[in-house]
Curated annotation (Swiss-Prot):
Subcellular location: Mitochondrion inner membrane
Assigned keywords, A-Z: Membrane, Mitochondrion, Mitochondrion inner membrane, Protein transport, Translocation, Transport
Family statement drawn from the similarity comment of this UniProt entry: Belongs to the TIM16/PAM16 family.
Domain notes: The J-like region, although related to the J domain does not have co-chaperone activity.
Role played: Regulates ATP-dependent protein translocation into the mitochondrial matrix.
Name assigned to this protein: Mitochondrial import inner membrane translocase subunit tim16
Record note on quaternary structure: Probable component of the PAM complex at least composed of a mitochondrial HSP70 protein, GRPE, TIMM44, TIMM16/PAM16 and TIMM14. Associates with the TIM23 complex.
Gene Ontology CC, one term: TIM23 mitochondrial import inner membrane translocase complex
Organism, as annotated: Danio rerio (Zebrafish)
Length: 129
């Protein structure tokens, strides 16, 4: 009786050990994929900053945006663009800064959307394994 009990315990420990090892490998693979995705997003964001000549923080300050939502960006852009129109005594320089800020934020939204799509596909592939 004790012999069978010991065998059951050993077999149970082996099953749990294998399951734990498999889960650990999957978690490690997922964390590596996430780290790679974050690294790529950082490179894309840096490229967008050099292309537009403006950092994400500068663009957010110019358009007075705290969260990146397309509606808020468009609303603030339209308001600031109209207010700074040269015909109503505004500044062309500031108006051009507003345009560049919107371009930079639109680029960041595009990068974020691409990352979400890639992450979604990676999650689907991971769930299939």
């Amino acid at each position: 009786m004790a012999k069978y009990l010991a065998q059951i315990i050993v077999m149970g420990a082996q099953v749990v050990g294998r399951a734990f090892a498999r889960a650990l490998r999957q978690e490690f693979a997922a964390s590596q994929a996430a780290a790679e995705a974050r690294g790529q997003a950082g490179r894309q964001s840096a490229a967008a900053s050099s292309f537009t000549g403006m950092t994400l923080q500068e663009a957010q300050q110019i358009l007075n945006i705290s969260t990146l939502t397309p509606e808020e960006i468009q609303k603030n852009y339209e308001h600031l663009f109209k207010v700074n129109d040269k015909a109503v005594g505004g500044s062309f320089y500031i108006q051009s800064k507003v345009v560049r800020a919107k371009e930079r934020l639109d680029e960041e939204l595009s990068i974020n959307q691409q990352q979400q799509t890639k992450n979604k596909h990676a999650d689907e592939q991971q769930q299939q394994t």
